[in-house]
């Protein structure tokens, strides 16, 4: 029996329609290169990519902990500071909302730029791990791609909204030698620190972008 359009949809049917609708919107957004997208659509894209990047970082961190966490902890019980700790960032909701949109974009770009070099080394280091799960390696590679795409999108938004302004360039990272160490504990401890920090930093950027979209796309009506 066919349902007429006037009949109410089931809950599962409504969810399916919503999922298909979201998929069609996303396909429309992702079918264009970043530079051709309207700013509102570009914000939509970077929000999705940002959330996906944080999800990848979180899952990869947990997978690394389960597989290699024990050898990472034997190197030392003290947590090493993140290499991005020197970047001044708003740390709580009040500070975020007191920070201008320009500065939130700047700090988001700075954080992502600081991960370009480490992620390249992380891919190589993870690939060299003994009996590394395929899922961990694929997530590491995909995270690098997501960060690059997110950085590209944010730079386009920044240059459109604040033409002539300059975002800070932060690329300092000095722990690459630990990833190349012949000592298993040293190498795994360095990887564990990087996974913990990239999970933290992608979460920060994800939160900043949600605030920016609310301000700049929805005029704080969200």
Curated annotation (Swiss-Prot):
Belongs to the somatotropin/prolactin family. Disulfide bonds join 82-197, 214-222. SUPFAM superfamilies: 4-helical cytokines. Its main location: secreted. It comes from Mus musculus. It holds the Pfam family Hormone_1. The gene is Prl3b1. GO terms for cellular component: extracellular space. Keywords: Disulfide bond, Hormone, Secreted, Signal. GO terms for molecular function: hormone activity. This is Prolactin-3B1. It is found in: Secreted. The keyword Disulfide bond applies. It comes from the Eukaryota. CDD domains: prolactin_like (cd10288). InterPro entries: 4_helix_cytokine-like_core (IPR009079), Somatotropin/Prolactin (IPR001400), Somatotropin_CS (IPR018116).
